[in-house]
Amino acid sequence: MTASFSCKMIASLDTGAGVYAWTTVEGITGNILIDPEGVIARPCTAAGDPLGDTLLDKRVGNVQNPDPDPGVRTAFLKIAAVLFMEKERQGRLPDAVTRTYW
């Protein structure tokens, strides 16, 4: 089974946070907000306004108030993890990321 997603930064907020639009090969889409320090991820609108209470803090390592939809929950976790890793690797939030898993 192959899983794939791509995400692209669509906004850099005045606070330094990045807003990404993402999509999976299965057609699941959304937006994710990464804080300026690169440690907090939240689902959000395209304008960067948080949606719901879902929150991933990489310092803690688990999701608070996860989405009940397993597809959305899994995609959110994978995308947040990759963005956190790229921030650490590059020293800044990436412009775009694509990943494929087999």
Task: Label every model-predicted segment.
Residues F5-E37:
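Amphipathic, interaction-prone secondary-structure segments
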Residues A41-W102:
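Acidic, low-complexity intrinsically disordered segments
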